[in-house]
Amino acid sequence: MGEVEQVLKEDGTPYKVGILIPSINNADELDIVLERLTKQTYPEFEIIIADSKSQDHTKEVALKHGATWIEDPSRNRADACNYALNMMDHDLVLFTDDDTIPPLDWVEKLVRWFSDPKVGAVGGPNFAPDEDPFGAKCADVAFCTKFMTAGTRYGAKPKGTLVPIHHNPGVNCAHRMANLREVNFFEPGCIGAEDVVLDAKIQRAGHKIFIDPNNIMPHRRRRPFKPYMKQMRNYGYTRMVANKRWPEISEKSHTVIGFFPWLIVGALLSVLGGLYLNEFSIWNQENILYYLMIHIPGGLAIFYICLAWLGAAIGTSPHRSIGTVFFAPLFVFLAHWAYGQGVNKAWAEIRRTGGKAGEGAQIDDRVRTA
């Protein structure tokens, strides 16, 4: 481990670097992450595993690779990270997940930017790894589709070497510990979108966030169909609840997608009703209302499919192919449907609790080892 020189602070001493990975019952994939991290080009850093009471061999995997293992009592990613951060004394904290495949120069490419004092945090894009199956690559293409992704930062790859940005996903980012302490780390009890909320807190404090478009983290996508849709449902649910507390992270598109399932149900009822009333003919124009009840939803569906194809074809996913682009409308539709369900669940939660942090629970979309 170590082929490059350490980045120095203003006082001439090296930054003390820590990599924090929250994990629960995912030892086999964590093993791959840690194996890659032990081969990094950057010479000195500590790996910390915040283990939320795993029932598998997570501890053994962590210790095998020389990582610091912390048994964490939390039940969400924000609190797990906070528990570990309160025990850490590093200058820089890098974050990733336990289902990534870190490039061997990942640490080097993140840490180098902190030689510039104006950089408060930096991150990079994430795409599905080449090892992912076809269905997961279809999900990646859907994540990175233009026009239809509700402002998600997954797959964001702007032009430039270091570009200002308002958010980096927690799977591929680094922060100054001083800034994290200043904002009291993650929002306690945040059940999801905790990385978005953290970046909002960092920016409220006056610090700047950047993205290095070339520092890509391969991140496994959920496979179709149940895990993929559960993930989308969780995104819609947790993001809308967080939006209630943090208005600056809210996008109008998040709310619009909440109406998507209702729109689909209405469109289906319109088509079925039109067919029934029009004697099951799609071309009979004797009653223009019945005709339009069939053809307006049908025309909108065709437009939706074509827009998804176009967005997928010009999106940022490296896994665009004839096959993955062809299936993009299906995966985009499933994402919108499930995300919309999550938004509706969030609206119910907000009516019940006001969106208070610590209420509710994430939807677990992972296949785990225990």
Segments predicted by a language model, with ranges:
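Conserved donor NDP-sugar-binding/catalytic core segment of glycosyltransferases
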Residues: 105-141, 216, 220
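A conserved acidic beta->alpha catalytic loop
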Residues: 36, 51-59, 100
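Short, acidic, metal-binding catalytic loop of nucleotide-sugar glycosyltransferases
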Residues: 35-44
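Glycine-rich, basic loop-to-helix element that forms the pyrophosphate-binding segment
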Residues: 72-88, 159, 163
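Catalytic donor/gating beta->alpha subdomain of glycosyltransferases that bind UDP-sugars
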Residues: 187-250
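N-proximal low-complexity "stem/linker" segments adjacent to membrane-targeting elements
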Residues: 1-36
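Short aromatic/hydrophobic "clamp" motif used to bind/position activated sugar donors
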Residues: 93
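A recurrent flexible, glycine/aromatic-enriched loop bordering the glycosyltransferase active site
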Residues: 152-175, 190-191, 197, 217, ...
